[in-house]
Amino acid sequence: MSTRRRPTPADGKDAGLRLVDMPGYGYASAPKSQIASWTTLIHKFLQGRANLARVYVLIDARHGFKDVDNDVLKTLDRSAVSYQVVLTKADQVKTSELESTLAATKAALVKHPAAFPEVLVTSSRTGDGMPELRAAMIRLLRERI
């Protein structure tokens, strides 16, 4: 056990950014019982977390919102946790399909009170949209420091 004190934002050593990859969220090659267990864990993690500055919800641009995504958005809305949708795998869809998915996503988010209005579009393979995603995170951090 360490007796050293953990750095705090006031020390200037920890900006308070934590990235959490949710297990089994979206697509997972696992038994349904395991996925159900992970889903419950995710919802419990997201509920009542006032310290979450923003959750970035990654949505596969090839498919748009799935039921599991809508359930998570409802949980975030009920918990008043701000979130921003990031469409991923933009390189794997035609431009016209991407534009349609983006428009449908923006239209759907109007009904979600905790949703941040700007939808980001990314491709990890080509790097498109990644600077914008990083910039959005940095802006948010600067607002909170």
What are these regions (language model features)?
Residues 1-14:
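Switch I (effector-binding) loop of TRAFAC-class P-loop GTPase G-domains
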Residues 17, 24-26, 62-65, 89-94, ...:
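Conserved nucleotide-binding/hydrolysis micro-motifs of P-loop NTPases
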Residues 28-34, 64-70, 94-99:
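Conserved ATPase-coupling elements of RecA-like P-loop NTPase cores
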Residues 33-63, 74-86:
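Inter-motif core of Ras-like GTPase G domains
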Residues 70-80, 139-145:
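Short, electropositive alpha-helical surface patch
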Residues 92-145:
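Canonical P-loop GTPase G-domain recognition
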